[in-house]
């Protein structure tokens, strides 16, 4: 299973915000510059993360974006559930005539649940705290 670029960059944006000194705001432009992703794509990602409460956007001259929760309260599995379309196969009888007898969807569903359960063991804080090599790569001080 490969995560979509939407989820990938959503996680990266959260990692960047969690790496900043506490309380420091950033901008969508800053995040796009760090990762080299289109601004339009990042705006959509940040909007969804904001609707889910993972990011807070502050308007105005001194505005920007920052984490909406503490990094230790953001489970990676929850973020993936929010951003990632997790249906691995299209099992409607319109597309597949073996749907009534097929057990593949159930097997894939169990595999996805195991994947997400493992990701639930990690918070955003686990990925960024005391990670000096990450801070250097992100040019965060």
Curated annotation (Swiss-Prot):
Q: Which residues bind [2Fe-2S] cluster?
A: 91, 96, 102
UniProt keyword Metal-binding present: yes
Which PROSITE patterns does this chain map to?
Answer: HTH_RRF2_1, HTH_RRF2_2
Q: Which cofactor does it need?
A: [2Fe-2S] cluster
Query: What does the Swiss-Prot or TrEMBL cofactor note state?
Result: Binds 1 [2Fe-2S] cluster per subunit.
- Sequence ranges assigned to domain HTH rrf2-type in this UniProt record: 2-129
Q: Which residues bind DNA?
A: 28-51
HAMAP family (UniProt xref): HTH_type_NsrR
* Its biological purpose: Nitric oxide-sensitive repressor of genes involved in protecting the cell against nitrosative stress. May require iron for activity.
Indicate what this protein is called per its UniProt record.
HTH-type transcriptional repressor NsrR
- Biological source species: Escherichia coli O139:H28 (strain E24377A / ETEC)
Name the gene that codes for it: nsrR
């Amino acid at each position: 299973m490969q995560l979509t670029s939407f989820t990938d960059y959503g996680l990266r944006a959260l990692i960047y915000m969690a790496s900043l000194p506490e309380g420091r705001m950033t901008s969508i432009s800053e995040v796009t510059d760090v990762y080299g992703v289109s601004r339009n794509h990042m705006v959509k990602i940040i909007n969804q993360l904001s609707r889910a409460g993972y990011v807070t956007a502050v308007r105005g001259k001194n505005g920007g974006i920052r984490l909406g929760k503490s990094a230790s309260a953001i489970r990676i599995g929850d973020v993936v559930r929010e951003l990632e379309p997790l249906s691995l196969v299209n099992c409607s009888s319109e597309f597949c005539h073996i749907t009534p007898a097929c057990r593949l969807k159930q097997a894939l569903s169990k595999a996805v649940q195991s994947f997400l359960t493992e990701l639930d063991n990690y918070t955003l804080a686990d990925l960024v705290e005391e990670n000096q090599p990450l801070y250097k790569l992100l040019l965060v001080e």
